[in-house]
Amino acid sequence: MLQIYNTLSKTKEVFTPLVGNQVRMYVCGMTVYDYCHLGHGRSMVAFDVITRWLRHRGYDLTYVRNITDIDDKIINRANENGEPFDVLTERMIAAMHEDEARLNILKPDQEPRATDHIAGMHAMIQTLIDKGYAYAPGNGDVYYRVGRFAGYGKLSRRRVEDLRIGARIEPGEAKEDPLDFVLWKGAKPGEPSWSSPWGEGRPGWHIECSVMSTCCLGDSFDIHGGGNDLEFPHHENEIAQSEAATGKPYAKSWLHCGMITINGEKMSKSLGNFFTIREVLEKYHPEVVRYLLIASHYRSPINYSEENLREAKAALDRFYNALKGLPEAAPAEAAEHVERFAAAMDDDFNTAGACSVLFELAREVNRLRDSDLPAAAALAARLKQLAGLLGVLQLEPEAFLQAGAEGKVDAAEVEALIQARLEARAAKNWAESDRIRDQLTAMGVVLEDGKGGTTWRLAD
């Protein structure tokens, strides 16, 4: 029985789709003005694992993750670069897809772009105006009347009267209430714009997601996800817009993943601790980064540090060392392990608990390796199958364990030395065998002798 923590109710609930076996999930994606940072990677990986598990459980999932391709940040960055905004966004979208592929992230079923849904935004804004939830003061802007929506604050547990304390209307704004937010922004010189019933302009951020989600998934759908930094005001405003426009409940369950901290501090450019995914992947294998991001529960914060990355690498080394050198086999039943893995994942996608089951399997594989090779191989196959549901342990063990050797050691030289050592051992020339091992150790190479022969990896 799958249970999900719903931010809307602040409780863990038994998950029941709105319609039969169909699950419709929308996740807020990237604003494509720069390369993806680790926080984006956290959200990408979290909802990738959720996608994999929902499909494994047999649900007919439609996964939609949007792209925000028009926004203040995009316009500012394009102007800084001296390039059209759409040239910038195309380049950043391509880079995002490269990062996702390296992190073994499945593609969403649909990836709508905001600029492809301008007409839908016009329609929803007009509906809100017609219903009295929005107003056009005549300066090209259109605003949402927060005070008109009785349920405002139900997601974030904020009270409108508290929000009004200290709020003020900025110069140049034509708001009726300081809490009102923009649905359509009147055009400014030098900025991209589209024609609309209220004049040239562009959409506000919040209306983009309301329109893209309902266009792709319908007025009501099962799951809405994103980082917990989006809970307010973005997701709160989405609810206000969508439910006022359609008269129906918007998303049934709201899932929010935790943030990334860097050595215990919030990641930010001003603190100089801001890392893009590609910067991290220059130093660490993509699977190490992915494992770091799944080793904690998706709602928990993750502290990014060199030490934690080394621990993630060590964990994967243990897994791949358990898998290596074993013959192909059908997965063992391993009913107890399978049940506990499923119980962890059914408990609000508890990947930390699931990973602990993988460690137990790896220990059992190692225990059986010398006494019952077929049983060890079958259990290793089950370990790999379960790990695949988390998107890890799908490489050839030697490929992972030797990854990063390029530019550090000559693989051909290592193989030649290993062969020379084998010949020395066969001739019982133990001194020569030890000399070669010492030479390889000095090169940073770790040898591991087993029934299947000698394998090697780089020292941590």
From Swiss-Prot:
Instruction: Specify one Pfam family.
Output: tRNA-synt_1e
Chain span(s) of sequence motif 'HIGH' region: 30-40
EC identifiers of the protein: 6.1.1.16
Give the binding site residues for ATP: K269
Molecular-function annotations in GO = ATP binding; cysteine-tRNA ligase activity; zinc ion binding
Per UniProt, the cofactor note for this protein states: Binds 1 zinc ion per subunit.
Q: Does the keyword Metal-binding apply?
A: yes
| Residues noted as binding Zn(2+) in the record, renumbered to the chain | C28, C209, H234, E238
Sorted alphabetically, the keyword list is: Aminoacyl-tRNA synthetase, ATP-binding, Cytoplasm, Ligase, Metal-binding, Nucleotide-binding, Protein biosynthesis, Zinc
Tell me where it mainly resides.
cytoplasm
Could you tell me which PANTHER family the record lists for this protein? CYSTEINE--TRNA LIGASE, CYTOPLASMIC (PTHR10890:SF3), CYSTEINYL-TRNA SYNTHETASE (PTHR10890)
Q: Which family does it belong to?
A: Belongs to the class-I aminoacyl-tRNA synthetase family.
Quaternary structure and interacting proteins, as annotated: Monomer.
- Which protein, by its recorded name, is this? Cysteine--tRNA ligase
